[in-house]
């Protein structure tokens, strides 16, 4: 599957996607701008890939500086094995679940550079995968799904500075959505966001919220993101330092995530109650990177509707068995979603499965257990002498 993007299936509440992110458009008036932003949410129209020669950035959308954003060492996983080249295949599935509306969005692009008309280097394959879990409406999730990849490919530092570019794309998307909401109040909503970029052997995951990415490394679950919950000690300290509070597990008693894009309509979230910036809810993503090796089998990305009922290792075990049976990431993502619904997930459920190898995951060989004697050599001699005496 080279690229997928979500469209609704009204009969069963599930979705699959077709189309590409839109070209950024210029506009000269507020009404025209609102129309442009509204067009972005029309899932039925055909969308063209970004072309660098046609990119026009609105004057207010200046690049957000992220020079102070870094990838923390504790969230960096390195595995040095050369000569491995990932062979990506992806599949995605989404279901409305027990909710009255679908607020999730996702994007899978197995050939990211080519899809956006960019020249690829000799670094190897490039791919982009994203899951966006909206709340209070679908608009923020759909906006992030369209705009994060757009800002990535527009950035002059892409792909040489992937970490900085990915962080900047989240923050620019948040700023752009604020402008969109100021032009059309009906767009007011928020979304968590997780984006994974594969470039050569480098996998970079940016997360803001409680979507999660889990890598299967020889059947072992490697979490490539951390859930940003208000009750997390690190997030709680940051929230309280920004003038917010955590009540009953909710940020300011209203939101069950500590990081998200949008939510500008919620008082005291993106701005402090005194009107100053840097409120307790931030869109800044947390990044994790790793170098892929032949031990890495597949990546699972899911919204919290998946992880509410799956432990990370449990999901890897489940997906691994399915891929061993059919080696089809689309079927595997569908089976993950269906299993989450069977386990009574109460949310929209979206899963993306990215296979990193052409062949299915191999059977794991259990290590042979070493036999430890419970008797010393002297004790064995004494026992043998005793048994010999019984025979006489």
From Swiss-Prot:
Domain PPM-type phosphatase residue range list: 89-356
**GO MF annotations, alphabetized:** metal ion binding; protein serine/threonine phosphatase activity
Biological process terms from the Gene Ontology for this record are: regulation of defense response to virus
Q: How is the cofactor bound?
A: Binds 2 magnesium or manganese ions per subunit.
Establish whether keyword Zinc-finger is in the entry: no
Q: Which PROSITE patterns match?
A: PPM_1, PPM_2
Q: Which GO terms describe its cellular component?
A: cytosol; nucleus
Listed SUPFAM superfamilies: PP2C-like
Q: What is this protein called?
A: Probable protein phosphatase 2C 22
């Amino acid at each position: 599957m080279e690229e997928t993007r979500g469209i609704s299936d009204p009969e069963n509440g599930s979705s699959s996607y077709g189309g590409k992110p839109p070209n950024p458009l210029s506009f000269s008036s507020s009404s025209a701008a609102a129309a442009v932003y509204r067009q972005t949410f029309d899932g039925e129209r055909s969308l063209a890939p970004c072309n660098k020669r046609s990119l026009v950035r609105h004057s207010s959308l200046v690049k957000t500086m992220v020079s102070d954003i870094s990838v923390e060492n504790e969230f960096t996983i390195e595995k040095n094995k050369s000569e491995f080249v990932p062979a990506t295949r992806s599949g995605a599935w989404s279901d409305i679940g027990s909710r009255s509306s679908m607020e999730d969005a996702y994007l899978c692009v197995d050939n990211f550079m080519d899809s956006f008309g960019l020249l690829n280097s000799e670094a190897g394959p490039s791919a982009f995968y994203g899951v966006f879990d909206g709340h209070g409406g679908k608009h923020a999730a759909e906006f992030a799904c369209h705009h994060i990849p757009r800002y990535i490919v527009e950035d002059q530092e892409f792909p040489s500075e992937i970490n900085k570019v990915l962080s900047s794309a989240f923050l620019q998307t948040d700023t752009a959505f604020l402008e969109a909401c100021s032009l059309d109040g009906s767009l007011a909503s928020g979304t968590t966001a997780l984006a994974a970029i594969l470039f050569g052997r480098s996998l970079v995951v940016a997360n803001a919220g409680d979507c999660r990415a889990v890598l299967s490394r020889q059947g072992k679950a490697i979490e490539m993101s951390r859930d940003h919950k208000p009750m997390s000690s690190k997030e709680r300290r940051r929230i309280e330092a920004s003038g917010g509070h955590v009540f009953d597990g909710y940020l300011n008693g209203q939101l069950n995530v500590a990081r998200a894009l949008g939510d500008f309509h919620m008082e005291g979230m993106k701005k402090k109650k005194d009107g100053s910036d840097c409120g307790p809810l931030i869109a800044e993503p947390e990044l994790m990177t790793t170098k892929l090796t032949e031990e890495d089998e597949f990546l699972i990305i899911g919204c919290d509707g998946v992880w509410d009922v799956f432990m990370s290792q449990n999901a890897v075990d489940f997906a691994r068995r399915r891929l061993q049976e059919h080696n089809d990431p689309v079927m595997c993502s569908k089976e993950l979603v269906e299993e989450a619904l069977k386990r009574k997930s109460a949310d929209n459920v979206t899963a993306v499965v990215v296979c990193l190898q052409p062949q299915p995951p191999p059977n794991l060989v259990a290590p042979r257990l070493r036999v430890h004697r419970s008797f010393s050599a002297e004790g064995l001699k004494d026992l043998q002498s005793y048994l010999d005496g019984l025979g006489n």
